[in-house]
């Protein structure tokens, strides 16, 4: 009679262990979202950059911290927000807002810039902004995916691990490509340095030859040779 409960406990323990191990693996290899609080002042600008890979999804949310909960924010607590790509393409633009969200897929690899501008106000106002920026696997809404697909949390964790594995695979190829580019750059640099060294040697020997010729002519005129 006790076999079934015992097996159930063993299965439940194994399941917890598997979930724990999966969670630890994801914490080690998955790109974490950046959550921060920015201190703003009227007339000031603060920018944050994030290195995002091509085809990575990125999600950002921001909101001004209300110093008096239950009351409206004062008129001085407003933001101008812009998000731009490494080449300057705008992915988000908002004016005179208290909160907002941006979602896009990176079209190129590089540093994406998010800038917060607090408009000028008199008297000067100070306030805080909560900002969370997620990219890659971390940016996906796994709770919504689980609800839509009607799948278990174990299946969600497995899908996360698959996405993490694919991400690592892509980054490995990118690292290999960068290494190849660096090797080509090194070869090109070495070739140029060799050519420059040869040119310097030729110029030096030519100048030395001219000096010897001039010295010989001078000594002959003085009848020292």
From Swiss-Prot:
The modification Omega-N-methylated arginine is found at residue 178. InterPro entries: Emp24-like, GOLD_dom. Residues 1-35 form the signal peptide. Glycans are attached at residue 186. The keyword Phosphoprotein does not apply. Residues 211-225 are cytoplasmic. It is a single-pass type I membrane protein. Residues 175-188 form a coiled coil. Belongs to the EMP24/GP25L family. Involved in vesicular protein trafficking. Mainly functions in the early secretory pathway. Thought to act as cargo receptor at the lumenal side for incorporation of secretory cargo molecules into transport vesicles and to be involved in vesicle coat formation at the cytoplasmic side. PANTHER family: TRANSMEMBRANE EMP24 DOMAIN-CONTAINING PROTEIN. This is Transmembrane emp24 domain-containing protein p24delta11. It comes from Arabidopsis thaliana. The lineage of its organism: Eukaryota, Viridiplantae, Streptophyta, Embryophyta, Tracheophyta.
